[in-house]
């Protein structure tokens, strides 16, 4: 039995117990890839790692693993790779690049600088709506894709790169660098301007720099699975 991990949907990062920073990823592409795998293969298990609101497949061969935030995603991905023999890892999830380090205000920052004192931060479970000039100080999140081959060198890794409003040449160059840096076996490159309604143009790039163009999510799923099968 082959085991797949598919990460899907968007990640939210907490500001306080009520508010979050998030993105608009629905998880539709991850679900489409999962459904195509389920239709084309019988002896598989899919670990579908997703956010609470992500679209998801419904099938007894799919194990749903919900995550809250990038650090939770990191813990659950590492646990999967350490405790299961994962044959394929398809990382479609839109992971946040930054998380909140602390929250303060401009006045508190000025006071800290003028007095050469520690920064006064807001630690309320719900920040008051009467606070003025809020400042969110962000810090980088861990890069999940860089963990995969370190934890499981033999796992077949598919990465995804999304840019906005760039040329095809630049898109493919950036995606290729992502592939090489993280030892991906395939990388899917797409531009936000090419994703609308039922259209979803993408370029699938293999380790030999062969580029296969896809026109929508179903086409991406079909061609991606075919390329994965041909290389294993």
Positions of PLM-derived features:
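A cross-family phosphate/adenosyl-ligand binding-site feature
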Residues: 1-232
């Amino acid at each position: 039995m082959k085991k797949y991990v598919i990460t899907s949907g968007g990640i939210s990062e907490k500001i306080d117990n009520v508010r979050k920073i998030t993105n608009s990823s629905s998880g539709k592409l991850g679900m489409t890839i999962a459904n195509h795998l389920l239709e084309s293969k019988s002896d598989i298990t899919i670990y579908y790692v997703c956010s609470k609101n992500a679209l998801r497949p419904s099938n007894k061969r799919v194990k749903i693993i919900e995550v809250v935030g990038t650090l939770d995603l990191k813990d659950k991905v590492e646990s999967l790779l350490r405790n299961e023999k994962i044959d394929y890892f398809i990382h479609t999830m839109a992971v946040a690049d930054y998380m909140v380090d602390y929250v303060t205000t401009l006045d508190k920052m000025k006071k800290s600088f003028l007095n050469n004192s520690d920064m006064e931060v807001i630690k309320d479970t719900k920040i008051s709506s009467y606070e003025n000039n809020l400042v969110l100080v962000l810090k980088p999140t861990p890069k999940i894709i860089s963990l995969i081959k370190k934890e499981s060198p033999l796992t077949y890794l598919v990465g995804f790169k999304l840019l906005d409003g760039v040329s095809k040449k630049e898109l493919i160059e950036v995606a290729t660098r992502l592939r090489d840096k993280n030892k991906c076996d395939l990388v899917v490159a797409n531009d936000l301007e090419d994703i609308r309604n039922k259209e979803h143009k993408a370029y699938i790039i293999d380790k030999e720099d062969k580029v296969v163009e896809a026109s929508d999510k179903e086409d991406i799923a079909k061609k991606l699975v075919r390329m994965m099968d041909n290389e294993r």
